[in-house]
Swiss-Prot record:
Protein's UniProt name: DBIRD complex subunit ZNF326
Bias type Low complexity, positions: 156-165
Alphabetical UniProt keywords: DNA-binding, Metal-binding, mRNA processing, mRNA splicing, Nucleus, Repeat, Zinc, Zinc-finger
Biased composition (Acidic residues): 527-556
Domain of life of the native organism: Eukaryota
Extent of Basic and acidic residues compositional bias: 317-335
Organism: Gallus gallus
Length: 566
């Protein structure tokens, strides 16, 4: 019987649904056996026989064998569509038709013996999906796409023989990378129509083959085990981008910047000679070479002018003048620094800051002459000098000179105090300024305090408070640390004082047996009207002492602020 006659047959559906979710058409037993070829098998068969039949591994014989009753006709479906193979699905649910996934997984329910016309006739029949299935394929079987799970490209568009599954449709040329869906194994059913022949909902380029997730196929997805992608097909992926027109200067896909066309420029070097008028005529021209890439390479000879007559280096005639100017700028910068330091100390400690007697080596400060005199004769001061001599390896003469510098500083401070007029009135004015604006509502009063330099704290001028601070463990630790700090800084102070050029000149006079401080005192007496400028570079040792004192005061302030924060 010609299988094409099935197109003209009147199909009618019985009321009783058949197995596999397919409404089998009514007719004689011989018609069913003849059309579907089940009668030739003779009885129930195992799963392996169906697998071999689906993969074309077993020759199909006795295609039109007749005979057999209803039991023989439906025997194979009973053995195949048992409860275990259906996976617990409702056997009476309509709408699956020939899209049954269990059948599709094993090659489909049609077999491999029928021509394309019979398949098209079954696909064109619209009654098989009358159960209201949402998996309606809008395309006919001849238009379904090929195996999109293999990424085979367009290698099998000319023939339908390679379309092993009825659920595959050739993708259009402008689709997602020639047959590769965006999300082929979507678990949302009809959301992804690309798995059932419909348009793809994804965007962008194909993502290649996605895993089968343990061999569990989603409904409607068919895997073609026959047509695996060949190495040539895999290598051909992405050929669309390679076939795009490339720039003329992109060999092998590597971008090369277009060479910039430049004109050869003759670079002239003029000789730096002031007594040669023909220097412009004798100007040297560098060697210019144009390489193959169009770039200009200039080779300069920087040593050529050095051998010419009248060659003169830059800055030879102005070297001495520049050194003098730099020295002047350095002196002015030092004086400006000293002036700012004096202003800072005056604002911080008051106008009487310069009237204090100090020892730069021991960091001792007092406003009483007796105290400074006793300090200069004390064992603590002598111990500091011995530490300086031990660390610096200075001679005994040098150490005596450093001690005389401190004594001379004390004498000059005493003279400054005597020359200051109205000292008591100025002190009273300062007291008034301190308490200015203070009222009874402010609850403020002036009290005496004792400053501890070791701990950087102010202690009330009370016997109990002072004794309590002396016995505190913080003062014991701070006293030892501060003593070590004084020793370290004393060495730096002595070294900086001796490095001062003015102090060096005084030291030379001191070694000769002269008194260098008397000359400075006489010069200072002539400048009594310029007391504010008395501590300028003429007193080098005092400048260095003030610098060291400022550094120590800054460290003390930092320690005090850190203690208050804690």
């Amino acid at each position: 019987m010609d299988y094409g006659e099935a197109e003209d047959r009147d199909w009618r559906f019985p009321d009783t649904p058949m197995h596999c979710g397919v409404n089998m058409p009514s007719g004689s037993v011989s018609d069913m056996d003849r059309d579907y070829g089940h009668g030739g098998y003779g009885g129930p068969r195992s799963m392996d026989s169906y697998l071999n039949q689906s993969y074309g591994m077993e020759s199909h014989g006795g295609g039109g064998g007749g005979g057999g009753g209803g039991g023989n006709r439906f025997g194979p479906y009973e053995s195949y569509d048992s409860g275990s193979s259906l996976g617990g699905r409702d056997l009476y649910r309509s709408g699956y038709g020939y899209n049954e996934p269990e059948q599709s997984r094993f090659g489909g329910s049609y077999g491999g013996r029928f021509d394309n016309s019979y398949r098209n006739s079954l696909d064109s029949f619209g009654g098989r999906n009358q159960g209201g299935s949402s998996w309606e394929a809008p395309y006919s079987r001849s238009k379904l796409r090929p195996g999109f799970m293999e990424d085979r490209g367009r290698e099998s568009y000319s023939s339908y023989s390679s379309f092993s599954s009825p659920h595959m449709k050739p993708a259009p040329v402008g689709s997602r990378g020639r047959g590769t869906p965006a999300y082929p194994e979507s678990g949302f059913g009809s959301r992804n129509y690309d798995a059932f022949g419909g348009p793809s909902t994804g965007r962008g380029r194909g993502r290649g083959h996605m895993g089968d997730f343990g061999g569990m196929h989603r409904p409607g997805i068919v895997v073609d085990y026959h047509n695996k992608p060949s190495p040539a097909a895999v290598a051909a992926r992405g050929i669309k981008r390679k076939m795009m027109p490339q720039p003329y200067n992109k060999p092998g896909g590597t971008f090369i910047k277009k060479p910039k066309m430049t004109k050869p420029i003759l670079k002239l070097t003029q000789k730096k000679s002031s007594n040669m008028k023909s220097s412009f005529q004798d100007s040297t021209i560098e060697e210019i070479e144009v390489d193959t890439s169009g770039a200009v390479v200039i080779y300069e000879d920087f040593t050529r002018d050095a051998y010419d007559v009248g060659y003169q280096t830059f800055g030879d005639s102005k070297g001495e003048g520049k050194s003098e100017e730099e020295e002047k700028r350095r002196i002015e910068a030092r004086r400006e620094k000293q002036r700012r330091r004096r202003e800072k100390n005056s604002e911080k400690y008051g106008d009487g800051y310069r009237m204090a007697f100090t020892c730069s080596f021991c960091k001792f400060r007092t406003f009483e002459e007796k105290e400074i005199e006793s300090h200069l004769e004390s064992a603590a001061h002598q111990e500091t000098l011995d530490h300086i001599q031990k660390q610096t390896k200075f001679d005994k003469v040098v150490m005596e000179f450093l001690h005389e510098c401190m004594v001379n500083k004390f004498k000059k401070t005493a003279m400054r105090k005597q020359q200051t007029s109205n000292q008591t009135e100025n002190a009273q004015a300062v007291e008034k300024d301190i308490m200015e604006g203070v009222t009874a509502d402010d609850h403020m009063m002036k009290v005496e305090t004792v400053h501890c330099s070791a701990c950087s704290v102010y202690v009330p001028a009370l016997h109990s408070s002072v004794q309590q601070h002396l016995k505190s463990p913080d003062h014991t630790k701070g006293k030892q640390a501060y003593r070590e700090q004084i020793k370290r800084e004393s060495v730096l102070t002595a070294t900086s004082i001796l490095n001062n050029p003015i102090v060096k000149a005084r030291y030379e006079l001191y070694v000769k047996g002269e008194n260098p401080f008397e000359i400075n005192d006489q010069a200072q007496e002539q400048q009594t009207e310029e007391e504010d400028k008395a501590e300028e570079p003429a007193e080098g040792e005092e400048e260095e002492e003030e610098e060291e004192e400022e550094e120590t005061e800054e460290q003390t302030d930092f320690t005090l602020d850190h203690t208050e924060d804690n």
